[in-house]
């Protein structure tokens, strides 16, 4: 399978650079996995597609203000994007500067604070901070908006680039399908008899990295930490028992559930995953998906194509572009039911 199969034309004007006034004010494109039928709706219409007894699985990771600005002791400016917090004083981070800092060199953080470059691990730098990392980030860090938003973060992003149910600190990118849900909608979902469960996957900056190979099969996914608890396993089993559907909110919830069911049976799991879901890979847990619109040639678009079928997904994206849907993190959403016999690009030529 070629990465180029997953490209599409996207006008720059359709990239959402700010959130709408209301979280649930987005549009919703629905895709029926059996018939391939599309429907243009509002996000609040999602309730009409839910059934009593369904289970919605959310990712409760919380985005940390992971971007720091500073300078080396020599005076050169640099930018730090924390990828993973290792302990109270150490992180793994991406560092952008004219020259990479060397082990032992000091970094002065804008707003107050100091770090030391401890070691380099391939593309990542291990940094040690004089004070505790999380309070420092909360005090002087910036929200790590994706590169395609291409604007400085604003005070409102601390709230809006965060789900209302965010709980466990550790992500450097939001699980964006969840940004559409406000407390009122969450209560309406519960009132309809739909159960909820929460996994944790700390989204890393690697989610924005382009696929740099020509053949999908040659791509190696970045790793991210996740946790699927016994409570989630029990909730999925109870959902199956009553004939409900497991509805993943976001691709990170899909990757969490499917990582914990690699042998076909869902089990509690805590640790790193590098699961790469693309056309041809079976799904063991998820029956329906709420997701945003993703970048061309991205692993997330490949995941959606594996779930809904390649021709159906690309047709849906063309319809979204033609109808002026807003794309990416602050954009609109899709509700997709799983295609029981999804085709890949090579089967549609």
UniProtKB/Swiss-Prot annotation:
Gene Ontology CC terms: cytoplasm
EC number: 2.4.99.17
Gene Ontology biological-process entries: queuosine biosynthetic process; tRNA wobble guanine modification
Superkingdom, natural source: Bacteria
Location of the protein in the cell: Cytoplasm
SUPFAM superfamilies: QueA-like (SSF111337)
GO molecular function: S-adenosylmethionine:tRNA ribosyltransferase-isomerase activity
This protein's pathway: tRNA modification; tRNA-queuosine biosynthesis
Enzyme class: transferase
Keywords: Cytoplasm, Queuosine biosynthesis, S-adenosyl-L-methionine, Transferase
Catalytically driven reaction(s): 7-aminomethyl-7-carbaguanosine(34) in tRNA + S-adenosyl-L-methionine = epoxyqueuosine(34) in tRNA + adenine + L-methionine + 2 H(+)
InterPro entries in alphabetical order: QueA, QueA_dom1, QueA_dom2, QueA_sf
Family from the record: Belongs to the QueA family.
Quaternary structure note: Monomer.
Protein purpose: Transfers and isomerizes the ribose moiety from AdoMet to the 7-aminomethyl group of 7-deazaguanine (preQ1-tRNA) to give epoxyqueuosine (oQ-tRNA).
Protein name per the record: S-adenosylmethionine:tRNA ribosyltransferase-isomerase
Organism in which the protein naturally occurs: Pseudomonas fluorescens (strain Pf0-1)
